[in-house]
Amino acid sequence: MDQHNNGVSTLVAGQFALPSHATFGLGDRVRKKSGAAWQGQVVGWYCTKLTPEGYAVESESHPGSVQIYPVAALERVA
């Protein structure tokens, strides 16, 4: 992956760091804005050609269950 073209930070301890422009950080509480309810903590991120900024969210109601969502589908929980 070309890290210079997609805003990804440099490799840290053999793992990718969050993008420098990330909307959410690891551990942030978020929920889906609409549709089926999902609320939890950000545990990772991903990027694809169609989703340049997406997050893996572990459910607060069902620990261990993780769903991935594009940034536009999520909002921060106070």
UniProtKB/Swiss-Prot annotation:
Write the Enzyme Commission number(s) for this entry: 1.5.1.3
Q: Where does NADP(+) bind?
A: K32, V66, Q67, I68, Y69
InterPro entries this protein is in? Dhfr_type_II, Elect_transpt_acc-like_dom_sf, MscS_beta-dom_sf
Catalytic activity reads: (6S)-5,6,7,8-tetrahydrofolate + NADP(+) = 7,8-dihydrofolate + NADPH + H(+)
State the top-level EC class.
oxidoreductase
Taxonomy, superkingdom: Bacteria
For this protein, the record's Pfam families field holds: DHFR_2
* Annotated substrate binding sites: I68
In which pathway does this enzyme or protein participate?
Cofactor biosynthesis; tetrahydrofolate biosynthesis; 5,6,7,8-tetrahydrofolate from 7,8-dihydrofolate: step 1/1
Q: What else is known?
A: Type II plasmid-specified enzyme is practically insensitive to trimethoprim and methotrexate.
Matches recorded under NCBIfam families: trim_DfrB
The name under which this protein is listed is: Dihydrofolate reductase type 2
Q: Which organism is it from?
A: Escherichia coli
